[in-house]
Regions:
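Residues at the starts of beta-strands that form the adenosine-phosphate
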Residues: 21, 44-46, 110, 135
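Adenosine-nucleotide cofactor-binding segment
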Residues: 40-96
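Short, flexible, glycine-rich and Lys/Arg-enriched loop motifs at helix boundaries
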Residues: 13-19, 71-86, 143-144, 165
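Glycine-rich phosphate-binding loop and adjacent beta-alpha segment
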Residues: 96-164
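Short alpha-helical
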Residues: 1, 30, 53-54, 96, ...
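Short internal alpha-helix immediately C-terminal to a glycine-rich phosphate-binding loop
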Residues: 1-41
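Alpha-helical segments flanking ligand/cofactor-binding loops in enzyme cores
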Residues: 36-37, 57, 99, 127
Length: 167
């Protein structure tokens, strides 16, 4: 459900298929792995980030086009902005990983943040927001109104359904 809310929020913020790679952090976790499958089902190019190198083949089997290691996405940087890499992101980790995502999002891109396994702090500057117009979308699945829940469950059963659920 949280993965569906994340994908839906990104699409409402302007993410479209063909706009570039979408990063999913914490991709071997529950929300992350389902987000990989949902994004792939919609036709997005998905890059999965994980700390588990042994899970690379599995992540590709559920829809990731590429897999990168967690140390690349959690590295702290003195730079407030880095090379633009991502058309969007589902961040299930938080902390330094979310800071990395914000400084590497494409102009106008968004990150849907739902996790805090990497910590609840956020060491960043306003520069990604005011120079690149990026958006930080908070995802709360606990208090989601029933009308939105129904809409998400419908999407989960249709266009967001990961293909690997059928195997």
């Amino acid at each position: 459900f949280t993965a569906a809310l994340s994908v839906d929020a990104l699409e409402h913020a302007g993410l479209i298929v063909g706009s570039g790679p979408v990063l999913v952090t914490g991709a071997t976790g529950g929300v992350g792995s389902v987000a990989v499958g949902m994004l792939a089902a919609r036709g997005y190019e998905v890059v999965a980030s994980t700390g588990k190198a042994a899970s690379s083949d599995w992540l590709k089997s559920i829809g990731a086009s590429d897999v990168i290691m967690r140390d690349e996405t959690s590295a702290e940087s003195p730079k407030p902005l880095e090379r633009e890499r991502w058309a969007g992101s589902v961040d299930c980790v938080g902390g330094s990983t979310l800071a990395y995502v914000l400084r590497t999002l494409n102009y106008g891109a968004s990150v849907a943040a739902s996790g805090l396994t990497g910590g609840n702090g956020l060491a960043t500057t306003v520069l990604p927001f005011i120079l690149r117009g990026v958006n930080l979308l908070g995802i709360d699945s606990v208090q989601t109104p029933i009308a939105i829940r129904r809409a998400m469950w419908t999407r989960i059963a249709t266009d967001l359904r990961p293909s690997w659920l059928d195997t």
